[in-house]
């Protein structure tokens, strides 16, 4: 039986380190002897229910850890379930009952160290590179046990489409990228070419070959296939490591890139520069025959470089990019790979690149910035020294990425511990029932204090192209180390709330100096347009986006500013200014003026705001309205708010709720769900937005209708149903935030009960 372990790690191991006793760490362990017959039956029932409905509801309900926590805490919902009939008014007591039921359930799924665990996954290309790397290095059997393999295969079977393929994420239609990666994972884990549940391998292979074969995989996939020996490096776009040797202010230096882009390029250019290829095993030779539509030795690699399946093509390469690739391919690379430049330039560039890889690994305790970078950095360390300490330290941190759900084993982005906790705590605080949920609040407060980043990246971080991190909060845990603006703003809001509550209930307030450090970090990220970025300050030319090599994502070359992050910062600063009016007073006031103007400028023609990190216009609009409301804007004095209210009211469905398709994100146009279905998360976001906009004072009817849907959707134990996927990044790839279905409905019910007049 699988069990989630919290804040655990071998403190005596020379291959793993921590900055705060592993607070926030969440790892899964399999114990074949654990679990009663009843517990095992519960888990199996959850798996079977997901399987039966897998084509209707793609994201898992994250029940494996929830069942465990609810058992361990002996949770029983004691507040009777409530429903609102047609024509019936929602009373204060009804709203209170629904809110308390949600709050008690949510408190019960809190971890012992104070954070809220959850799945944060969804893309089908997160897991396979871990399998690829471990296969190449010979560690696949030791890291992924038979229990792991069963869960990986369960995940792939559950998310295989009826046409035999897989999308780039669990809700997307079949793609070459997702299908090739998933097929290779099954085969490397030991399935034969015609094995797998419901002929999984044969159906996947047919999809690949019917769509042109593996040469049509996007450029990112071509890189990993070259590493595996299923492709030739001559069939990929050049990634010269020499760019690291340019002056850092030069437009093509990686320092100008968005941090995730930079840190993918970093190990990839090392592997490319060495033309590294893993062992050509009999299985690799067989896979060459299975995946290509012509004999491997007959393929014209030069011609396949620019090929990409139509199913995967979201961002076509501009002409200027094709010219750059061809220049590097035909002119630059032939020079850099021949004597004397291969010895005096290429070797020096590779050493410089490896030095930066080691720096980033050490700064993140070998977690790295994310799951895409992790296996690449791990492999680069193995290529440098298969018996080296760096590679062994990487192996110890694989567990930090693994997540087990009723749909199987997947790989996380890197965990959303702090983000979910900061939002969840605000939802609980809004309930205004401190006496009932004091222990959950105190543990959450303690977690946030321990999760704040206390130091900057190690050594001379500016020479390694890093922004300062002291005072920030990460998306995941402190060991991860990567500062995030909105996680910092939302965590700061929590700490400020807690400072106004009785310390005997919620714990001592956070050290003001630590709060000042958080403010300093947020201030450092404001761009000249008034918005703030996520990880590092924006500023590189947006024209560099023309060089985006990833055909299925957009806006990933340079850092951008974001409405949601800016709105969170406004809310945090308005609250901070009231409690600490003297710290950087003038700078905060100037920040707020520019930030509000930025949000107003970013509003779309229909009155909404595009959500960059959530689906989509309902998500962005909720955050934007929260920021404007905090800054003192109202329906009467702000045209942007009036236009936003009009958008929200027009988007309301006949059932009283709201529901938006993930397709809004890539299309950049509001797309309702088929049949104008509603979801509890979108409904909650819209309710929060309308409350921010003062709709309760004008006409609360739309809010009442939305809350009725929330109350009637609540499950018997206080949970809410899992529905559509709710997160996104880079326009076209979705992320599953499993806690959103609890956080936002709870928050909406709490704000409704506090701010909307209700009959007793």
Swiss-Prot record:
Gene Ontology annotations of biological process type: triterpenoid biosynthetic process
GO MF term set: beta-amyrin synthase activity
Cysteines engaged in disulfide bonds, as pairs: none
Tissue: Mainly expressed in fruits.
Gene Ontology terms: cellular component: lipid droplet
Keywords in alphabetical order: Isomerase, Repeat
Pfam families reported for this sequence: SQHop_cyclase_C, SQHop_cyclase_N
PFTB repeat ranges, renumbered to this chain: 99-141, 149-190, 441-485, 515-560, 592-632, 641-689, 703-744
UniProt catalytic activity: (S)-2,3-epoxysqualene = tirucalla-7,24-dien-3beta-ol
Pathway noted in the entry: Secondary metabolite biosynthesis; terpenoid biosynthesis
E.C. numbers: 5.4.99.56
Active-site residues, record numbering mapped to chain: 486 (proton donor)
Function: Oxidosqualene cyclase involved in the biosynthesis of limonoids triterpene natural products such as azadirachtin, an antifeedant widely used as bioinsecticide, and possessing many medicinal applications including anti-tumoral, anti-malarial, anti-rheumatic, antibacterial, anti-inflammatory, anti-pyretic and diuretic effects. Converts 2,3-oxidosqualene (2,3-epoxysqualene) into tirucalladienol, generating rings and asymmetric centers in a single transformation.
PANTHER family, per database record: BETA-AMYRIN SYNTHASE-RELATED, TERPENE CYCLASE/MUTASE FAMILY MEMBER
Family note: Belongs to the terpene cyclase/mutase family.
Listed name of the protein: Tirucalladienol synthase OSC1
Organism this protein belongs to: Azadirachta indica (Neem tree)
